[in-house]
Structures are given as C-alpha cells and as structure tokens.
C-alpha cells in the first residue's frame, strides 16, 4: 500500500470508530433516561410498559397502608389516582397530602416503586409535580 492509501485507511477507521462510540454513547444515555408522568398520563396510557419511569403527584389522604416495610398508597393529581406498592423504608418527610416522586415500573396496572422521594419542606413542590397538578386542573 502507498502512503496515501495507508492514510485514507486510517482516516476511515477513525471515522468509523468515532461514529460507533457516539452511537453507543447516545444509546446508553437514552436507555437511562427516566421520564416523568402524572397519574393522568399513566391512566391515558402515555407511560412506557415494562420500562422504568417516574410517577409524581400528591399522596392521597387516607390511602397509606403499611405492612412491615411494605407500603401501599395512592398518588393523585386531583384528577386521577394511581395505586403504588413500595417495599423499603420511606423518607422521613413522607406523609399523606405531601408531594412525592416515585421511580419504578407499571406491572399489571399497579406501579411498583423502587424509590420514593418526598419534598423537603412545606413550601417546596418539585417542578414536575407542580406542572402535572396544574395541567390536570386545566383539563
């Protein structure tokens, strides 16, 4: 091979390598995204089936049922309510009427949470939850 052919081969391999690295990086990034949905979005079928996502809203009054570390509660956006099952220790700030965001997946119509995040003080509302509640009110 001539010097020029060697250089062209090297450039072609470099372009292929950079393209492959970019593709794999974007694919990994996309697979790790967790989209936020309100109970209304989940009820309307907008949430992914079999994939992890975030569900946010308010913990419905009189809905928390504890059985050891297993907890069942309802999350509402005041239009629709969705049942959540969680096994684990809840945050100290978790209580009925509080804004929360849960991470998990939908299995047989029940949201199985792997993580529960509660808002940090009385005046704070996670932006996603505030937007979802406002959107639900306007429907």
Curated annotation (Swiss-Prot):
Write out the similarity annotation: Belongs to the CcmE/CycJ family.
What is the protein's known function? Heme chaperone required for the biogenesis of c-type cytochromes. Transiently binds heme delivered by CcmC and transfers the heme to apo-cytochromes in a process facilitated by CcmF and CcmH.
| GO MF annotation list | heme binding; metal ion binding
GO terms for cellular component: plasma membrane
Xref: InterPro entries: CcmE, CcmE-like_sf, NA-bd_OB-fold
Offer one example of a GO biological process linked to this entry.
Answer: cytochrome complex assembly
Q: What is this protein called?
A: Cytochrome c-type biogenesis protein CcmE
Q: Which residues cross the membrane?
A: 8-28
Per the annotation, which location comes first and is thus the protein's main one? membrane
Which keywords fit this entry according to its UniProt record? Cell inner membrane, Cell membrane, Cytochrome c-type biogenesis, Heme, Iron, Membrane, Metal-binding, Signal-anchor, Transmembrane, Transmembrane helix
> Which SUPFAM superfamilies does this UniProt record tie to the protein?
Heme chaperone CcmE (SSF82093)
Residue ranges that the UniProt entry lists as topological domain Cytoplasmic: 1-7
- Tell me the HAMAP family matching this sequence: CcmE
Stretches in topological domain Periplasmic? 29-139
What gene name is given for the protein in this entry? ccmE
Organism the protein comes from? Ruthia magnifica subsp. Calyptogena magnifica
Question: Which NCBIfam families does the record associate with it?
Answer: PRK13254.1-1 (NF009727), PRK13254.1-3 (NF009729), PRK13254.1-5 (NF009731)
Chain sites annotated for binding heme: 120, 124
